[in-house]
Regions:
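Membrane-interface extramembranous regions at the lipid-water interface
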Residues: 1-31, 59-76, 92-116
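Membrane-helix interface segments in multi-pass membrane proteins
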Residues: 31-59, 80, 95-99
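N-terminal regions that are enriched for targeting/export leaders
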Residues: 117-137
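Glycine-rich N-terminal segment of FAD-binding domains in flavoprotein oxidoreductases
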Residues: 140-232, 248-253, 472
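Structural signature of FAD isoalloxazine-binding scaffolds in flavoprotein oxidoreductases
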Residues: 179-199, 254-273, 299-305, 493
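C-terminal substrate-binding/cap subdomain adjacent to the FAD-binding core in PCMH-type
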Residues: 246, 264-458, 462, 466, ...
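Substrate-recognition/cap regions that form aromatic- and gly/pro-loop-enriched pockets
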Residues: 413-535, 539-542
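Activity-critical C-terminal alpha-helical subdomain
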Residues: 426, 521-624, 628-633
């Protein structure tokens, strides 16, 4: 949090839009009020004077950055010395004047410093002289040791690596998945970020063919000049096409669904070092198996995607009780052909109200001066608010009743590409050392919406989960992908929460995550695989009943199990492990319980609801660690 505060309070570089300036000003005055009250109450009212220089400095800094947005120098603030008229003039331009053009001498430094957030490269291990590297994902919770990292830049390079290595193969995308979906222990790890070029573009047919490690933001920049937009992409433009294909992503597109619905064809490198072209009509078994199957069989080298016209969209939002949402969606959103994007945010900690946001096609003029969002934007304020919402009491209430009404006040009209130009940096904390932010996602048939919502809320409350936000999207059925998470029309619950990085907390999260996965399976839904793989093998197959088709296909096309990652290390070919556990002759009853995930979780619930003498999370973890060290209960 410190770096973010410094950027707001002490930095005079950068720019602030009107809405950002308003929020920054509100934050400064609220902070001043809290500190003033504490000093006045604890020490004396005379000591409150020490806050004045800090208040003036902060207001001067953020006002300077607002003037930069208007292409003016911070020296304009000296107009306040002119009685009445100077203050009135500054107030009007700071709070009401629209932004000036993006490129001006006050903000050019940002272009040099910022790009879309990227995860760092694999880390060398200092005490080893070999090629081993540590590969981690965005949460920092699940590092994986790989034997070697290769960096191909072409299909020929990939073929060369596959021919000349006997190690298992894992493939690196953007590494924004939150377990080990891009890595496997002791594998040859392919860092494919060099394969990021446009292969073919057809403006008339509205299609584009790209190398699979091109990011969505790079495609947007390429096609925006032709007034075209990506048909279906992932929420954040940082992610690669390969990563999105591997997880069969979706977004807020109301008339669409999973990414596979907008894919024309793919070019795939198989484990036998052959290149195949696959589509709905050619090698369709490979096509339907590749998309959404997390690099289990092949390397998706290139993809041909469908495009749409880039149109203006207008924001419309409505707050309502959660119980009224399904009827509202069916009556006002699903039946409206002009709706382009739609999602809602459910407010923790009570989950009784939501804010539904729709972006509708419009002929109105955009309220932003640029066709694409500022890719170098500073997210200091967002980081501070995320920390406040997650750490301080009553601030979730403050967000619902104070912050969001301000954020959603006024008219907003964007171009479709602008609204799809999100940077995952706005979710990234300054540090993930002691705590981290994590995503989960659940797909619920729309007719079971209220049933699942009530169970979800109860689980989060009982386990005291630090939920930041629950956002929902809509998706139409996908009957093509073997790993389809939308076998019927669904609502997608995207859960953003905060957890500590301690082993006790990891164990606690695993327990309530599996409980929630049971809840979504009970309503004939599914959980999303890009996140922490806590589910049991039984839960996996219940959520993805077509997975056995893919296992059969993998045994045919990758009999040596060359293509791997933590997902398939966990769920593929687990029969041997299950047999080993079932035939174990351990005499410890505690060990028998903790060797079985189902009974281990039931024991956690017993500690939580019946034997509630000690904190169940710490006590459960202590017992589980003790059983690993002992072979009996004595």
């Amino acid at each position: 949090m410190n770096n973010s505060v410094k950027k707001i309070v002490f930095s005079f570089q950068g720019k602030l839009s009107r809405s950002e300036y308003f929020l920054y000003t509100l934050f400064v005055w609220l902070s001043y009020y809290v500190l003033y009250s504490c000093i006045w109450y604890i020490i004396s009212d005379n000591m409150t004077i020490i806050l004045s220089p800090f208040l003036l400095w902060a207001l001067f800094a953020i006002s300077t950055k607002r003037l930069h947005d208007l292409w003016r120098s911070g020296k304009f603030l000296f107009l306040v010395l002119i009685p009445v008229l100077g203050f009135v003039y500054l107030f009007i331009i700071l709070f009401f004047k629209k932004s000036s053009i993006i490129n001006n001498r006050y903000i050019e430094w940002n272009k040099v410093e910022w790009d879309y957030l990227k995860n760092p490269s694999a880390c060398k291990i200092e005490w080893l002289d070999g090629d081993e590297r540590i590969v981690n994902e965005v949460t920092g919770l699940h590092p994986v040791l790989v034997s070697k990292v290769e960096t191909p830049t072409s299909i020929q390079d990939v073929l060369h690596v596959l021919k000349n290595t006997a190690w298992p193969i894992s493939v690196w995308g953007g590494r924004f998945s939150m377990w080990g979906q891009t890595a496997s222990y002791n594998s040859t790890h392919l860092d494919m970020r060099g394969m990021n070029q446009v292969v073919d573009f057809n403006k008339k047919e509205k299609t584009i063919k790209v190398q699979s490690w091109m990011r969505w933001c790079d495609i947007q920049k390429y096609i925006d000049v032709h007034n075209l937009s990506i048909s279906i992409m992932q929420t954040y433009a940082n992610f690669t096409v390969w990563g999105s294909l591997s997880v069969n992503v979706h977004w807020r597109y109301i008339w669409l669904g999973p990414l596979i619905l907008s894919v024309r064809s793919i070019d795939i490198i198989l484990s036998d070092v052959t290149l195949k072209h696959a589509s709905r009509t050619k090698n369709k078994e490979i096509f339907f198996g590749a998309i959404g199957w997390y690099n289990a069989l092949w390397v998706i080298a290139q993809a041909e995607l469908e495009l749409e016209k880039n149109v203006a969209v207008k924001r419309v939002n409505k707050k309502m009780p959660t119980s009224e949402y399904k009827d509202y969606f069916i009556k006002y959103i699903r039946s409206k052909k002009k709706s382009i994007f739609h999602n809602w945010d459910m407010y923790p900690p009570h989950y009784k109200s939501i804010n539904a946001v729709t972006w509708e096609k419009t002929n109105e003029k955009p309220t932003t001066k640029t066709r694409l969002m500022y890719w170098w934007k500073d997210y200091s304020l967002e980081k501070i608010f995320f920390w406040i919402f997650s750490e301080l009491p009553f601030w979730k209430w403050f967000r619902e009743y104070m912050v969001d009404p301000l954020l959603f006040a006024g008219k907003k009209v964007h171009m479709r590409n602008y609204e799809a130009w999100y940077d995952v940096a706005d979710l990234e904390p300054n540090s993930r050392k002691k705590s981290t932010y994590v995503l989960l996602e659940y797909f619920v048939p729309i007719d079971r919406f209220e049933e699942f919502t009530n169970v979800m809320a109860e689980i989060y409350k009982r386990h005291n989960v630090n939920i930041i936000n629950v956002s929902m999207r809509h998706a139409h059925p996908d009957t093509e992908s073997y790993m389809s998470w939308a076998r019927e029309e669904v609502f997608a619950f995207v859960v953003y929460y905060k957890q500590a990085t301690s082993e006790v907390e990891k164990n606690k999260v695993a327990v309530w995550t599996r409980e929630l996965e049971d809840a979504v399976i009970a309503v004939n839904g599914a959980y999303y695989l890009p996140y922490q793989a806590h589910a049991t093998s039984e839960q996996f197959h219940k959520a993805y009943p077509w997975a056995k088709k893919l296992f059969k296909l993998k045994s045919k096309l990758d009999p040596d199990f060359r293509f791997r990652n933590i997902i398939w290390d966990t769920y593929y070919k687990t029969d041997t492990l299950v047999e080993a556990i079932s035939t174990s002759k351990e005499t410890s009853e505690f060990k028998e319980v903790f060797l079985d995930t189902y009974w281990s979780d039931r024991f956690y619930l017993f500690l939580q609801n019946i034997y509630h003498i000690y904190p169940e999370d710490s006590f459960h973890y202590l017992i589980s660690q003790s059983t690993k060290k002992c072979n009996s209960d004595e």
